[in-house]
Amino acid sequence: MKLEEFNYELPEELIAQKPLANRSKSRLMVVSINSSDVQHNHFEKLPQYVKDGDLFVINNSRVIPARLFGNKKQTGGKLEMVLLHPLEGKDEWEVLVKPGKRAKPGNVFEFGQETLEAEILDITPEGSRRVKFYYQGNFQQVLDQLGQMPLPPYIKEELEDPERYQTVYAKESGSVAAPTAGLHFTPEIISDIKDQGGEVAELTLHVGLGTFRPVETPNIEEHEMHAEYYQLPEETAKKINQAKQRGNRVIAVGTTVVRTLETVKTDDGLVQPGKGWTDIFIYPGYEFKVVDAMLTNFHLPKSTLLMLVSAFAGKDLIMSAYQAAIEERYRFFSFGDAMFIKN
């Protein structure tokens, strides 16, 4: 398929620069695949679409303040570092650095008042760096003190409250971008879902910076996906398999959950618990085995996430729904409105 088929024109003022004051006041477009029907609602009304036995699967990953600004220990030269993901070795991470010429193996950089030091171990084939951190106490607390949230490049305004770039159920630290479909949920909505007979189960997928990487190949099949770390607990796998066997819906909250569940699927449409790395690329023609419905935000033109939702609902339906969203002045991307895709 041609990349250009996933392009659309978005007025710049529809890119949400800030989260709404109230999470659940976001708008909710409800897209029904079978009837091609599109309804306009608000996220706080989501529980009215819940059927008895529905299982909502959420991603409990927490965004880390992964952006650090420091100085070269030997010369004082400035450096920006973005943490990508932890490696096998203790306190070792893969990171991006800017400017790259300052970060050669053996160089040491310091952040804060000697609170944190990073030694460059080597350079990866992709140009990122493998580093080892040295610090006192708890690494997460040091990061919270020194780091900044690496907001998406299309968000130009400063985030007043970093917690608004976290879901209310975020707990497993490791993402460098939020699983944004979950940003609309409040404890009250989760409670209302359960009151309607729905269940909620958790998994973890740490969102990488690759989620913002544009597709550059004219034919989408040639695109190489980035890998992201996931963990599907036994308890969640059990709940999913029970829902599938009962004939209830498994509703993925976000594309990160979709990718995880479709990675761990078995031939009979069930899932296996486990952890690992996924580079699954879902585009039209893909046959979904586990996910029956999904909640998601409005995605960038030509992005792999737009391809994923097009695979689920059909490209023509999604592209016409996006045009309707533009006409109705929906808010787009990370801090924008939501879409519920169901049969």
Swiss-Prot record:
Gene Ontology terms for molecular function: S-adenosylmethionine:tRNA ribosyltransferase-isomerase activity
Catalysed reaction equations from the record: 7-aminomethyl-7-carbaguanosine(34) in tRNA + S-adenosyl-L-methionine = epoxyqueuosine(34) in tRNA + adenine + L-methionine + 2 H(+)
Cellular component aspect of the GO annotation: cytoplasm
InterPro entries to which the protein is assigned, alphabetical: QueA, QueA_dom1, QueA_dom2, QueA_sf
Keywords from the UniProt entry: Cytoplasm, Queuosine biosynthesis, S-adenosyl-L-methionine, Transferase
Subunit text: Monomer.
Known role: Transfers and isomerizes the ribose moiety from AdoMet to the 7-aminomethyl group of 7-deazaguanine (preQ1-tRNA) to give epoxyqueuosine (oQ-tRNA).
Name of the protein in question: S-adenosylmethionine:tRNA ribosyltransferase-isomerase
